[in-house]
Amino acid sequence: MEPRDPSPEARSSDSESASASSSGSERDADPEPDKAPRRLTKRRFPGLRLFGHRKAITKSGLQHLAPPPPTPGAPCGESERQIRSTVDWSESAAYGEHIWFETNVSGDFCYVGEQYCVAKMLPKSAPRRKCAACKIVVHTPCIGQLEKINFRCKPSFRESGSRNVREPTFVRHHWVHRRRQDGKCRHCGKGFQQKFTFHSKEIVAISCSWCKQAYHSKVSCFMLQQIEEPCSLGVHAAVVIPPTWILRARRPQNTLKASKKKKRASFKRRSSKKGPEEGRWRPFIIRPTPSPLMKPLLVFVNPKSGGNQGAKIIQSFLWYLNPRQVFDLSQGGPREALEMYRKVHNLRILACGGDGTVGWILSTLDQLRLKPPPPVAILPLGTGNDLARTLNWGGGYTDEPVSKILSHVEEGNVVQLDRWDLRAEPNPEAGPEERDDGATDRLPLDVFNNYFSLGFDAHVTLEFHESREANPEKFNSRFRNKMFYAGTAFSDFLMGSSKDLAKHIRVVCDGMDLTPKIQDLKPQCIVFLNIPRYCAGTMPWGHPGEHHDFEPQRHDDGYLEVIGFTMTSLAALQVGGHGERLTQCREVLLTTAKAIPVQVDGEPCKLAASRIRIALRNQATMVQKAKRRSTAPLHSDQQPVPEQLRIQVSRVSMHDYEALHYDKEQLKEASVPLGTVVVPGDSDLELCRAHIERLQQEPDGAGAKSPMCHPLSSKWCFLDATTASRFYRIDRAQEHLNYVTEIAQDEIYILDPELLGASARPDLPTPTSPLPASPCSPTPGSLQGDAALPQGEELIEAAKRNDFCKLQELHRAGGDLMHRDHQSRTLLHHAVSTGSKEVVRYLLDHAPPEILDAVEENGETCLHQAAALGQRTICHYIVEAGASLMKTDQQGDTPRQRAEKAQDTELAAYLENRQHYQMIQREDQETAV
């Protein structure tokens, strides 16, 4: 199919904005035809030229695959279509349609270029949108202009125009011009350095939004023949579903010939084994090309999990994968997608959400009876996530690059997970006096993957669930939720509502009656556990030794562990203890004589007197995150004793991490050395953690020689400094999966979220390093007037009184600007309270950056305080200095929410804008090539 010529409007002289795409075009000044070298191939692309030696591509009507004819009834141009933020699966879906999200990115010029940008003519600045799949940014009013420059997004499907739907096809690159580009040129190996990149209009790179390869935008690096080369789909080619597999089907025509065929085949259809789902017409069909090297992936994201984590992570997957393999579960669930991809060989699934999301997908797979069932990996969002912990995926998503997650899914081991049936029926022997009007005869779920429990824990969960249903506005804060849980648990303990549990139940396991044993134990909670983890990571079965009658717990052995909890063992569970082991069995018959709170995988209810049978349902196929293998082992397998590693340990504060973790060199410079540890060469991080925690306990150790080191907090974690283009945190639950040699070279970095204060930074002003003189410079003896007060208290008083000169004098004399009062309020807190702009500016300029996000005893930062007081200028100072707008106080409020409560709508709008900008900055940097 020959490419069409660019429209006259596309022949522009705008050299400041251009695009090169397998479905797009380039724009720039027309070079003289006799001087412009052309590609020496049979196929020519009108408008494609070289402009001297500066640019590789400057203007193009390039169409590797001419756009398919428009679907009847579908809008023709981008401007006539609605602005979509989701993938269009209807028959009118546009070829190469962008997926737009709102953005506050201000450093990127509008992609359509100055000639076609309509926003510059508007009186106010226009909002911008960013395509999640190809990362271009345009003004919202300019989206329709993309049609004029003939630029489309990377195609996610192909048309079924040929009778041979399995005709050999390949994917072409989708080249896009970039004004900013990280990484190095694939041809020359040099970086894309450019001065003043934030406001530059210069095109510095050409990159493919499929394989992420990037080249300098000059003819010496990017050759014209590369435009038509097949794309490898990049490092994740094994999991990316190529657009050539996805065909848009044509709706059958009701012609006379077709109707005769329909009548002739009607008897066949009556005897067909296809279900109604399989037989109905769909706009898109999947025609895979099987390959033993491929593990095609479907990603299901629950956007409601983990706050807004789910909604944000969808955008990252749209960038790395084909948008038609990423599904938002709030748009209809997983069934349609699984039906459509059911015939794809070697399929894998990534469930992004909590354990409930995983259970939803597993139940859908049961209903569809896919053979073989695709293995399911987990990206845990939110809290809890005991199944994800069991399979080594961790207790929650922190900031691991999506690219690394895709690699883990591809390389993960396939394991089995027992799933258990729950059958409940009313107990006919229960008397009418035992009936409870608030009880139900049905369980919330009829299958469980994690656990089934009754008693104390189910009662607390049920109280929380019912209270949240009645007053959802009171449960919008994680802190409040925890406080409610604690209060409910304490009141339930005092009332003893579950102390007589053993009197009202009968438990028979594999034909053995455990009721007498349970009545002797008098547990307040009984758990039937399938996996080792329970209650956000605890291990209630523990590790039975060889002298016990029990086996270690497994999630694939066809056995349930039955555990009883007294109040003592429940308390011990949180500090590494375990419950009372009752038995391991294959079948349970549980009879309750009265209404009792129960929960199934965290879903609670009050179940009327019932007979409950628990038996093995089936085994689900899961993906377990594999332990990483060192690419360069430090010793050969023949060595009996591992080589010893001597590694420097350096600590990073949370403020420095949030500000600099995309810049490795700056973050390394900001780190504070703790000392040196010596570990075996094959150590994993669990073993290394023990050595680091002993570091400061040794009186003669390296840690003791560092006078500025504060003790490590209990929440510190390792940072991976080698396997990605930036630093990222390693979940503590996954430390046993990572070797020391894989995350560090000569130095290992750890993140301490509670590291705060002047002593964390060795380069702070001291009495021996005076500041430059100022009009407020003290005269000899000028500081003696307040000698009765300690220097720290004098600083506090100076901030309270708005005494700028006094504050400067004290600082020059060695005063600690990170000093706090008895309520943990910093000098900046006091300066904000008095509204002293001069003192605030001085503290922001001279105090260490940790002061920005320092919290007082109520959890408030100085920005929370300024927002609540409506101090707009001070808020601006603090935000521009780099304060986090996403920190919450003890009420769960961000600074923006504090401004809203103060009814300052303009300030709230400003803070919301800057908060969104902070989030977008992180996302943009995370997609660096």
UniProtKB/Swiss-Prot annotation:
Cross-referenced InterPro entries: Ankyrin_rpt (IPR002110), Ankyrin_rpt-contain_sf (IPR036770), ATP-NAD_kinase_N (IPR017438), C1_DGKzeta_rpt1 (IPR047485), C1_DGKzeta_rpt2 (IPR047484), DGK (IPR037607), DGKI-like_dom (IPR056383), Diacylglycerol_kin_accessory (IPR000756)
Top-level enzyme category: transferase
Disordered: annotated span: 1-46, 59-80, 257-281, 421-441, 760-783
Low complexity bias: start-end ranges: 15-24
Keywords: ANK repeat, ATP-binding, Cell membrane, Cell projection, Cytoplasm, Kinase, Lipid metabolism, Membrane, Metal-binding, Nucleotide-binding, Nucleus, Phosphoprotein, Repeat, Transferase, Zinc, Zinc-finger
Gene Ontology annotations for the cellular component aspect, listed alphabetically: cytosol; glutamatergic synapse; lamellipodium; nucleus; plasma membrane; postsynaptic density; Schaffer collateral - CA1 synapse
Residue spans of biased composition, Basic and acidic residues class: 1-14, 25-37
Localization, UniProt: Nucleus; Cytoplasm, Cytosol; Cell membrane; Cell projection, Lamellipodium
Motif, Nuclear export signal: chain positions: 362-370
Skewed-composition ranges (Basic residues): 258-273
Top-level taxon of the source organism: Eukaryota
CDD domains named in the record: C1_DGKzeta_rpt1, C1_DGKzeta_rpt2
Pathway it works in: Lipid metabolism; glycerolipid metabolism
Catalyzed reaction equations: a 1,2-diacyl-sn-glycerol + ATP = a 1,2-diacyl-sn-glycero-3-phosphate + ADP + H(+); a 1-O-alkyl-sn-glycerol + ATP = a 1-O-alkyl-sn-glycero-3-phosphate + ADP + H(+); 1-O-alkyl-2-acyl-sn-glycerol + ATP = 1-O-alkyl-2-acyl-sn-glycero-3-phosphate + ADP + H(+); 1,2-didecanoyl-sn-glycerol + ATP = 1,2-didecanoyl-sn-glycero-3-phosphate + ADP + H(+)
Residues with Phosphoserine modification: 706, 782
GO MF: alkylglycerol kinase activity; ATP binding; ATP-dependent diacylglycerol kinase activity; enzyme inhibitor activity; kinase activity; zinc ion binding
UniProt-listed Pfam families: Ank_2, C1_1, DAGK_acc, DAGK_cat, DGKI
Residue ranges, compositional bias (Pro residues): 764-778
Phorbol-ester/DAG-type zinc finger segments: 98-153, 173-231
ANK repeat ranges, renumbered to this chain: 823-853, 858-887
Family according to the record: Belongs to the eukaryotic diacylglycerol kinase family.
Protein's recorded name: Diacylglycerol kinase zeta
Lineage: Eukaryota, Metazoa, Chordata, Craniata, Vertebrata
